[in-house]
Amino acid sequence: MSIDHDLHQMLFQQREAQTQHLEYNQEFQYYNAIASGDIENVSRYFMKEDDQAYSGDEYGKLSGDSLRNARYHFVVAVALITRICVEHGMERETAYTLSDIFIQKMDHLQTVSQVAALHNTMVVDFTKRMQKQKKENAYSIYVMRAIEYISAHLHDKLQIAAIRLPRQQAVT
């Protein structure tokens, strides 16, 4: 079977069952709440910590095995959260290492409910770190990027041109 055939078949089945993935803007409201450190808003989205977690139509089905499906969704979520938090000023190496730690912890879990509980823990951890960062840092994203570059190149000869963020790559 071809991918196109599979795609058309699945889209047809979803239309027949009247199911669809979570709306894009709703998904990013959630991710932006994490990145802005809004723990109150984020808590509204907590995962039910039971064996039905990740099984709703809005999540999509990544595997027929419920535990593997939960694991795949966890990895997708932590990858997106990591990148959005970096985009909003979290130090890159901290974010990626935190992501690695959570994925390694998830890899040892044996039930969907354990994965869901770790998912909630991971979301709270990233959200609180972003909240703390916003309170502590009065630096612009440009200064944060320069600090990150300098930290990563402590043993290299630093040049201003390499540190400077070009206007077209500027992040607001």
Cite the ranges covered by each PLM segment.
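Generic detector of short alpha-helix boundary/capping microenvironments
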Residues: Q18, D65, K134, S151-A152
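Basic/polar phosphate-binding segments, predominantly the helix-turn-helix DNA-binding elements
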Residues: Q133, H153-T172
